[in-house]
Each structure stands twice: as C-alpha cells, then as structure tokens.
Amino acid sequence: MGKDKLGKGIDALLQESSDRYDVRDSGGVQTVHYLDPTLLQANPHQARRTFAQESLEELAASIREHGVIQPVLAEKNQDGSWVIIAGERRTRAAILAGLNRIPVIVRTCDHEKKLAIALIENVQRENLNPLEEARAYQHIMDLGNLSHEELAQRVGKNRSTITNALRLLKLPPEVQQSLSSRTLSAGHARALLSLTDMQLCVSVAQYVVTHALSVRAAEECVACLNRGGSLHDYAGARAHTAASSPSPGGSATDITRLPPSSPSTDAQLDARIRNADIADIEQQLLEQLGTKVRISGNLQRGRIEITYFSQAELERLYGLLKAH
C-alpha cells in the first residue's frame, strides 16, 4: 500500500530489508522502517546542544515499557549513513533503554527544511533553551535570507517573539553562557539588553544570579544604572529597604517605596530609580515593538522614545503603530 502511493522515491533510499508499516500525516501515507538506533547520527546543525541525563533516563524507562510511540524522522545519505532530522532525544533514550530497532520515517529534504523541522519540533516541545532557540532562528534566517516576519510564519510564532529571541544574541558571551545553562531566564536576559556597557552587563548578570533577583528586580536594577546610578547604589537601596518594614501596599524589596532617610539619599535615589510601573510598561512596549523603548516622566505625563536603526526598521514600526 505504501509502495503504490509513494512510488520509488523513498524505497530507492532503502536497500536493506526491514519491517514496515504505513502511517498517515498531512502529507499522505508515509512508510515507517524499523532501524537500529545506533545507526542514526545526530544532525550537526541541530539547534539543541544539551540533553539532561535525568530526563533521558525518564524517557528511556517509558520507552522500555511502551516502546517508541512516535517515529523518528531521518534522512539517508549517499554514503549509506543515516542522519536524524527530528527525534534525537528519542533516539538517545532508545539506545539507553537497550532497544535495537526503532520506528523511523525516511524523508529527503534540503538543509533549510531539515533545520526548520527540527526547530519546530523542539520549540513545540519546549526542549530548547532560549539561546539555542535564538541561534536556530538566526541560522535558518541566514540560510533562507528570511525576514523576521517570514521566519515567524514558518515556525508559527509571532514576529515580536522572533525579534526578542534574536536580540539575546547581542549579549556578552558570559551572559549567553548563563542563559544556556538556564542560570538566567530569558526575562532576566531581556532586562540586561538595554545596558550598552558589556562589562557592566556581565557584572549585573553575576549580581542577579548571586542574589537570586526576580525579573522585576533585575529590571529595577538596570533602570537604576540607566539613570546614572551604580550597582553599589542599587545594592545599598535594596539592602536598606529589605531591612525595613514594608509600607502598606509595598513590599520589603520594592525600592520605589524607600523608607525615610536623609534628604540627600532620597533625592539621589529618586533621580536614579524609575517607577516600577513605568519600567513594566516600557518592557511590554519593547516586546510588542521589538526595539528599545524609553519612557521619560510619570504615569500622568511624559514622553515615549522609540529607537530604530534603519529606514526599513522605521517603516516596520510605522506599520505596527498604524495597525493599532
């Protein structure tokens, strides 16, 4: 049945005899072959770089009991070797479980398509860390000369999601490493993006990790620095506030609600630390527009400054604002 509908395309790729059965997907009937998982090589351009051992062992235990339910997607090279397009984690777990045959769908596609398939699977399963996802987006864009909008359509994401992910690649290597190891979240990393001094960015990232700051606290710290303050200023204000009882409606770590102290200290901190609500609105605008946004003023009156770096970027922003 599979052979009649598929013709010789896939069968020509398979010289060895193997057990097969047919499954249906959006592309029609596809033949599934049972192959030794140790023959399947990892795709060198796979976006995902790390596999948690504990997670693999849990999947291996499930595979021992139920088998590999979803076939791996792979391609056979001209030299007879097999390369995984999607399903490397399943393959690793199957080997760990001791299986000598797993279901594999054979497909031939170009490099860009293979990357897109692997990326979509990983993103849908939330397997990639934020930096792996950003690098994969960039790689596919470079290969296909795609715009943010075109890539967003291919992987089923909002354009702003793609833009915000790619901005993480501008962070210093040390901060990217923290992001890869999930020591920093994507929210923490986005808060650091407005710091233009790379060494300061690294120092703030280390402070955020050491003191286990929330994303909101990290945003407040960066806001303090962008207002002309120092990391020492922020740390002092945070320690002062944490040591005092919170005011009604405030919190022990809300540095925008500082307890009474000397007038000079209050005036300095007032000038350096923005209202948390303003910072939150600023962050939301950044995520929606995909570019740096700065709000000067307060909740009653002020000015919004939107940064762009080219005519194309200006036209894109104009289109977004006009649509709303």
Curated annotation (Swiss-Prot):
Keywords on record: Chromosome partition, DNA-binding
Residue ranges with Low complexity bias: 242-252
Superkingdom, taxonomy of origin: Bacteria
Location of region: Disordered: 240-266
CDD domains tied to this protein: SPO0J_N
InterPro entries: Chromosome_partition/occlusion, HTH_ParB/Spo0J, ParB/RepB/Spo0J, ParB/Sulfiredoxin_dom, ParB/Sulfiredoxin_sf, ParB_dimer_C
UniProt GO cellular component terms: chromosome
Record carries keyword Zinc-finger: no
Gene Ontology biological process terms from the UniProt entry: chromosome segregation; positive regulation of sporulation resulting in formation of a cellular spore
Keyword Ubl conjugation (UniProt): no
Pfam families: HTH_ParB, ParB_dimer, ParBc
GO MF terms held by the record: DNA binding
Function text: Involved in chromosome partition. Localize to both poles of the predivisional cell following completion of DNA replication. Binds to the DNA origin of replication.
Family: Belongs to the ParB family.
NCBIfam families documented for this protein: parB_part
Name of the protein in its database record: Probable chromosome-partitioning protein ParB
Species of origin: Treponema pallidum (strain Nichols)
